Amino acid sequence: MKKVAMLGAGSWGTALSLVLADNGHQVMMWGHRAELIDQINELHENKDYLPGVELSSSIIGTADLSEALKGADFIIVAVPTKAIREVLKKALPYIPKQSIFVHVSKGIEPDSLLRISELMEEELPEEYRKDIVVLSGPSHAEEVGLRHPTTVTSSSKNIKAAEAVQDLFMNQHFRVYTNPDMIGVEIGGALKNIIALAAGITDGLGYGDNAKAALITRGLAEIARLGTKMGGNPLTFSGLTGVGDLIVTCTSVHSRNWRAGNLLGKGYKLEAVLDKMGMVVEGVRTTKAAYQLSQKYQVKMPITEALHQVLFNGQKVETAVESLMARVKTHEMEDLVNTFENRVK
């Protein structure tokens, strides 16, 4: 049995706590809302974020970071990207020496343009940095909570740390693979939220399956293009954290990014969408960061650019779609063709 500190009492933190409890581990789930912690401890349910799912008595809620972290073998960071730095700063005085950090959030920090593992490296003491692990893949919390079959990927610079997390989570309902390509895993997980927003917009506009299929396919090309330029392995984007996560996020009503995009497609303004959602929509912040990354690495990302225009410059969604369809003609495998031609030269 391992002691696990789950930093974050949202839907994903709760669902992962359930997996860990099923595996016989003791989970201390930290959250800052006292009424939510009381729910978890007294009703054994998270009515706000994962209603209808009974939680094991081995999952204990706390609003005290020192209590959550005491003796923890693993520390799972399950808070939104924008809160990670603040939470880590508060946690620093209480981190046990033997702990392995795992992050399960999908995003990129705007302005700094850091992946989450890089952000964590800036905040954590040196002895913890080499063992940071990312757990990512096509995994809606609602389905994990119901113990539906789910597969994800564990990635780290240290393969032993990735394998330790694989062993920690893996069971008959929750299969975990390892992948040493941390860059590709994080970029795929973050950028799919952009394409999910766009997929929701096309559905909100009533454009049908043809448009969505094109969007997912060309969206994957954008993700792979940027991810490879940043040092990721191209093969990673055809795996669970690339095409797998993209499919599940672009086609499911469980996806908050898809739901937000759907509202945008139906004519809601961004502020109204975020207010109506009542939950973090990572794709909005990630769109800004990915647009900045596309400029930095000089990578063509037309879908990301179009969504950036809609979200931050007030462009109508119909106009954005028209601009995408009116782009100059090109080869579908443009990057491969250019690479081949350069080699021939």
From Swiss-Prot:
Sn-glycerol 3-phosphate binds at residues 106, 137, 139, 192, 245, 255-257. GO terms for molecular function: glycerol-3-phosphate dehydrogenase [NAD(P)+] activity; NAD binding. SUPFAM superfamilies: 6-phosphogluconate dehydrogenase C-terminal domain-like (SSF48179), NAD(P)-binding Rossmann-fold domains (SSF51735). It comes from the Bacteria. Keywords: Cytoplasm, Lipid biosynthesis, Lipid metabolism, NAD, NADP, Nucleotide-binding, Oxidoreductase, Phospholipid biosynthesis, Phospholipid metabolism. It is found in: Cytoplasm. One of its GO terms (cellular component) is cytosol. Its EC number is 1.1.1.94. The keyword DNA-binding does not apply. Pathway: Membrane lipid metabolism; glycerophospholipid metabolism. The active site is at 192 (proton acceptor). NADPH binds at residues 11-12, 32-33, 106, 141, 256, 280, 282. PANTHER family: GLYCEROL-3-PHOSPHATE DEHYDROGENASE (PTHR11728), GLYCEROL-3-PHOSPHATE DEHYDROGENASE [NAD(+)] 2, CHLOROPLASTIC (PTHR11728:SF1). This is Glycerol-3-phosphate dehydrogenase [NAD(P)+].
